[in-house]
Amino acid sequence: MSTKLKGPDGRIPDRLPDGTPAVSWERRWTEGSLPLWLVATVGGMAVLSVLGLFFFGSFTGVGSA
């Protein structure tokens, strides 16, 4: 990645002065931060897994009557 695309704070701007994207969509998948939808999907799956574990535990083991 060239350093001339970076702004004063080190981040890459979304658009160049002529309006074209600064970074192609292919490179956005491999460089920089993770997409928010991916983080939310993994986090949601983790929450559902923990809740499922609690429900499973309520029907088996200690406290299952």
From Swiss-Prot:
InterPro entries: PSII_PsbJ (IPR002682), PSII_PsbJ_sf (IPR037267)
GO cellular component: photosystem II reaction center; plasma membrane-derived thylakoid membrane
Keywords linked to the UniProt accession: Membrane, Photosynthesis, Photosystem II, Reaction center, Thylakoid, Transmembrane, Transmembrane helix
Pfam hit, one: PsbJ
Composition skew (Basic and acidic residues), residue ranges: 1-17
Chief place where the protein resides: membrane
Family: Belongs to the PsbJ family.
Protein's UniProt name: Photosystem II reaction center protein J
Recorded name of the encoding gene: psbJ
